Amino acid sequence: MALVLDGRALAKKIEADLLVRVEALKAKSGRTPILATILVGDDGASATYVRMKGNACRRVGMDSLKIELSQETTTEQLLAEIEKLNANPDVHGILLQHPVPAQIDERACFDAISLAKDVDGVTCLGYGRMAMGEAAYGSATPAGIMTILKENNIEIAGKHAVVVGRSAILGKPMAAMLLEANATVTICHSRTQNLAEFVKQADIIVGAVGKAELIQKDWIKPGAVVVDAGFHPRDGGGVGDIQLQGIEDVASAYTPVPGGVGPMTITTLIRQTVEAAEKALA
């Protein structure tokens, strides 16, 4: 029977440790770590995600500062808000909720975030440092996936990892992190021909493509480790990017959907904010 890589249970364990660290930081410095969240526009799903991150802050004893901007906000206005947060010594992490309205240059705004406060790992500078093996906060979802693999003693070095998806905040940093952990990495994407043939070679498969159940169960190599970073609402629940029904009969380990990667994305963001506060208040 396959090992279930339970992200919810691991997130609770990490949050318990973070609560202790935050209390110690408060006792030592008299300050509380603060994550600033910026929500632009009225996207319902984005508002839900921001609320979940605020709840996670409270669970570990942190504060969150919620900045809400109108749908008509310009790039210049958003950059001005980010610069205020960069300059605010009480703010230790900055999250710009993706996506932003179409008129905004999202990349310019991501890159305006101070490296010391880039706890969601979205800046080009942070990505470049991470890809070169230097210290930087990792993009939250792939960094959370790496924690899941390491905490469950999944062997990475020397394994063939196939990442399906090449987005700037998931697929590309995921591949870089696996490479840094000494995996042999293949990146597949929308232009990849014969996708199934690549997936069938994978010791570790990461679904990060954003298409419901694109990766079929019968493509999975027996004994592979299956990581599904997708979520697509369906019939009161949801499915991921990988066809998981019956996967326990094929894989050696897998992340469920929901309850696998998702909880660890938020917990990683919170953990990196605590780390940023510890550095700032040392």
UniProtKB/Swiss-Prot annotation:
Entry superkingdom: Bacteria
Keyword terms, alphabetized: Amino-acid biosynthesis, Histidine biosynthesis, Hydrolase, Methionine biosynthesis, Multifunctional enzyme, NADP, One-carbon metabolism, Oxidoreductase, Purine biosynthesis
Reaction(s) the record says it catalyses: (6R)-5,10-methylene-5,6,7,8-tetrahydrofolate + NADP(+) = (6R)-5,10-methenyltetrahydrofolate + NADPH; (6R)-5,10-methenyltetrahydrofolate + H2O = (6R)-10-formyltetrahydrofolate + H(+)
Matches recorded under CDD domains: NAD_bind_m-THF_DH_Cyclohyd
GO molecular function, one term: methenyltetrahydrofolate cyclohydrolase activity
Disulfide cross-links: none
GO cellular component, one term: cytosol
Any Pfam family hit: THF_DHG_CYH
Classification via SUPFAM superfamilies: Aminoacid dehydrogenase-like, N-terminal domain (SSF53223), NAD(P)-binding Rossmann-fold domains (SSF51735)
Enzyme Commission number: 1.5.1.5, 3.5.4.9
Keyword Amino-acid biosynthesis on entry: yes
Annotated family: Belongs to the tetrahydrofolate dehydrogenase/cyclohydrolase family.
Protein name per UniProt: Bifunctional protein FolD 2
Organism, scientific name: Acinetobacter baylyi (strain ATCC 33305 / BD413 / ADP1)
Gene: folD2
